[in-house]
């Protein structure tokens, strides 16, 4: 299932939220988003289960929780307005649903940037079958 996220990002091209989120990640972490975060830990990528493995994975867990609060639009496909100003991400949509999705992505990208030093190559391409501990609540 998580491999579908990679395919979706590639197929979306310059359209859609996943591309926008990937662009935010690159800006905030300096890492290539798909290679570094599409299949990382228990939560970075499509879906998620178990306990986040480190602070980087926790950013993705919180992002999943944030997407869970979104109503009235598909957070993985919604296209929103945003810009980069003075090293920060600024969400600029008037539509509440799109602004919420943008803010979820913004917070996750900032979190990943703040925790880039916790990134552990051992969690790249991490098998979801290792994510067996009980998940915490959002």
UniProtKB/Swiss-Prot annotation:
Reaction(s) the record says it catalyses: a 1,2-diacyl-sn-glycero-3-phosphocholine + H2O = a 1-acyl-sn-glycero-3-phosphocholine + a fatty acid + H(+)
GO molecular function: calcium ion binding; calcium-dependent phospholipase A2 activity; phospholipid binding; toxin activity
Active site (record annotation): 63, 105
InterPro entries on file: PLipase_A2, PLipase_A2_Asp_AS, PLipase_A2_dom, PLipase_A2_dom_sf, PLipase_A2_His_AS
Residues of the signal peptide: 1-16
Domain of life (superkingdom): Eukaryota
Cofactors named for this entry: Ca(2+)
Covalent S-S links between cysteines: 42-131, 44-60, 59-111, 65-138, 66-104, 73-97, 91-102
A Pfam family hit: Phospholip_A2_1
Residues binding Ca(2+), per UniProt: 43, 45, 47, 64
Family classification: Belongs to the phospholipase A2 family. Group II subfamily. D49 sub-subfamily.
Main function: Snake venom phospholipase A2 (PLA2) that exhibits high hydrolytic activities and shows strong preference for the anionic micelles (dPPC with deoxycholate) to the zwitterionic micelles (dPPC with Triton X-100). PLA2 catalyzes the calcium-dependent hydrolysis of the 2-acyl groups in 3-sn-phosphoglycerides.
Name of this chain's protein: Acidic phospholipase A2 Drk-a1
Organism for this UniProt entry: Daboia russelii (Russel's viper)
């Amino acid at each position: 299932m998580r491999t579908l996220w990679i395919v979706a990002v590639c197929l979306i091209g310059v359209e859609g939220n996943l591309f926008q989120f990937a662009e935010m990640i690159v800006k905030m972490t300096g890492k290539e988003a798909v290679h570094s975060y599409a299949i990382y830990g228990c939560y970075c990528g499509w879906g998620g289960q178990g306990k986040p493995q480190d602070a980087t994975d926790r950013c993705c867990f919180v992002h999943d929780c944030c997407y869970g609060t979104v109503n009235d639009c598909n957070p993985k496909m919604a296209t929103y307005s945003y810009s980069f100003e003075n090293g920060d991400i600024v969400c600029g949509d008037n539509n509440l649903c799109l602004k919420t999705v943008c803010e979820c992505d913004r917070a996750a990208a900032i979190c990943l940037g703040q925790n880039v030093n916790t990134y552990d190559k051992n969690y790249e391409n991490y098998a979801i079958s290792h994510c067996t501990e009980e998940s915490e609540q959002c």
